[in-house]
């Protein structure tokens, strides 16, 4: 296949982030300067974000058999880049207090972003695997970045070993799918499944192993055991990336796979996915009830949020509304998570040992940082799915899709899970307004709202509220971002 200038325009975000990786690498080799390398990383990610406009003008197309650039890919690429940008912004003040090498952090985030962009454009199982590995490998280093902290090192080792096992399941599953169908392209797989091959035992075994591998990456029950420990052990900015960019990119490619290769047409696959979704929603919410560490709580809550999204994935063959539901839900989840983890990052900056992740650290926050407490309250309400926030719009969409597809038992799970979630999210929100302890622990800087991280947190809160009241611009954007069929 000949690469034309149009193809290069379609690949602009990938090329710009790749170029930024090289520039930052050379800059680190030339001179260690934290501010310079952080600025170069942020400029590169912003340029990649702006380039999406030019990609849109070029139109939808296939770039090599591995990648497809269309509205769907552009939307998810934009979300991944926003999450990466926020991660770099939150990391800067945290790294200011870090005595070891600071600059490599941005290099690892950029490489992981590259993997995320590759995943959102993937149209082939080979591209899917490459993207997942490219996003996972830098995370091994990022999670253990504060390696002098026992929890951070433990979390990194745990994630590395389990991630390697999950990747082997995924790869073996792909091998079985290829052995039965002779294809790795999503569309070619779809044609094979349309010819009645879906009920072949070897193919079902292959998809089953792929579900195990992808279930680990998305921290779905019962492949979730690493999640709370890794969220707690990783530095707060890394937990931000793990909860947002990583999940969005992987869920995006799974959506495309299920759309082109209708695996959900198999009753066995639908039942397995339904059980995983049900268990993730109920278990994730129940485990979050007893948490006193805010990062562990958000880790368990992310399990339930992926369970809600899985309901929309199961209903994918019922109509286009599922695509819309996932797009809106992921946008709401992104901004809510950026705000919540952003507050934790601000409270934990600069690096002085363990993060300010104990619920006790946030007790009475309103009385000395009222705006920060208000932002955290908005994020908790959005994650709980309270009306007038973007989280409510996403949850409403998921319920509507579940009802449309007659998935009544999963709709009941969403309702029960949301009711349980309301308790622990409100518990965090209420603690912000209690009497402050006599000896307060960690605290955000007095001028936090003037820092880049503070601005990102405030913009996230504003978007959650504005789009919660007037979601039409977001809905219109998601409706435009349909995949090329």
Curated annotation (Swiss-Prot):
<feature type="transmembrane region" description="Helical">
    <location>
        <begin position="203"/>
        <end position="223"/>
    </location>
</feature>
<feature type="transmembrane region" description="Helical">
    <location>
        <begin position="271"/>
        <end position="291"/>
    </location>
</feature>
<keyword id="KW-0813">Transport</keyword>
<comment type="subunit">
    <text>NDH-1 is composed of 13 different subunits. Subunits NuoA, H, J, K, L, M, N constitute the membrane sector of the complex.</text>
</comment>
<keyword id="KW-1278">Translocase</keyword>
<keyword id="KW-0472">Membrane</keyword>
<dbReference type="Pfam" id="PF00361">
    <property type="entry name" value="Proton_antipo_M"/>
</dbReference>
<dbReference type="GO" id="GO:0048038">
    <property type="term" value="F:quinone binding"/>
</dbReference>
<feature type="transmembrane region" description="Helical">
    <location>
        <begin position="455"/>
        <end position="475"/>
    </location>
</feature>
<keyword id="KW-0520">NAD</keyword>
<keyword id="KW-0997">Cell inner membrane</keyword>
<dbReference type="InterPro" id="IPR010096">
    <property type="entry name" value="NADH-Q_OxRdtase_suN/2"/>
</dbReference>
<feature type="transmembrane region" description="Helical">
    <location>
        <begin position="235"/>
        <end position="255"/>
    </location>
</feature>
<comment type="similarity">
    <text>Belongs to the complex I subunit 2 family.</text>
</comment>
<feature type="transmembrane region" description="Helical">
    <location>
        <begin position="8"/>
        <end position="28"/>
    </location>
</feature>
<feature type="transmembrane region" description="Helical">
    <location>
        <begin position="127"/>
        <end position="147"/>
    </location>
</feature>
<dbReference type="InterPro" id="IPR001750">
    <property type="entry name" value="ND/Mrp_TM"/>
</dbReference>
<keyword id="KW-0812">Transmembrane</keyword>
<feature type="transmembrane region" description="Helical">
    <location>
        <begin position="159"/>
        <end position="179"/>
    </location>
</feature>
<feature type="transmembrane region" description="Helical">
    <location>
        <begin position="297"/>
        <end position="317"/>
    </location>
</feature>
<dbReference type="GO" id="GO:0050136">
    <property type="term" value="F:NADH:ubiquinone reductase (non-electrogenic) activity"/>
</dbReference>
<feature type="transmembrane region" description="Helical">
    <location>
        <begin position="408"/>
        <end position="430"/>
    </location>
</feature>
<dbReference type="GO" id="GO:0005886">
    <property type="term" value="C:plasma membrane"/>
</dbReference>
<dbReference type="GO" id="GO:0042773">
    <property type="term" value="P:ATP synthesis coupled electron transport"/>
</dbReference>
<feature type="transmembrane region" description="Helical">
    <location>
        <begin position="373"/>
        <end position="393"/>
    </location>
</feature>
<comment type="function">
    <text>NDH-1 shuttles electrons from NADH, via FMN and iron-sulfur (Fe-S) centers, to quinones in the respiratory chain. The immediate electron acceptor for the enzyme in this species is believed to be ubiquinone. Couples the redox reaction to proton translocation (for every two electrons transferred, four hydrogen ions are translocated across the cytoplasmic membrane), and thus conserves the redox energy in a proton gradient.</text>
</comment>
<protein>
    <recommendedName>
        <fullName>NADH-quinone oxidoreductase subunit N</fullName>
        <ecNumber>7.1.1.-</ecNumber>
    </recommendedName>
</protein>
<feature type="transmembrane region" description="Helical">
    <location>
        <begin position="326"/>
        <end position="346"/>
    </location>
</feature>
<feature type="transmembrane region" description="Helical">
    <location>
        <begin position="35"/>
        <end position="55"/>
    </location>
</feature>
<dbReference type="GO" id="GO:0008137">
    <property type="term" value="F:NADH dehydrogenase (ubiquinone) activity"/>
</dbReference>
<feature type="transmembrane region" description="Helical">
    <location>
        <begin position="105"/>
        <end position="125"/>
    </location>
</feature>
<keyword id="KW-0830">Ubiquinone</keyword>
<keyword id="KW-0874">Quinone</keyword>
<feature type="transmembrane region" description="Helical">
    <location>
        <begin position="71"/>
        <end position="91"/>
    </location>
</feature>
<keyword id="KW-1133">Transmembrane helix</keyword>
<keyword id="KW-1003">Cell membrane</keyword>
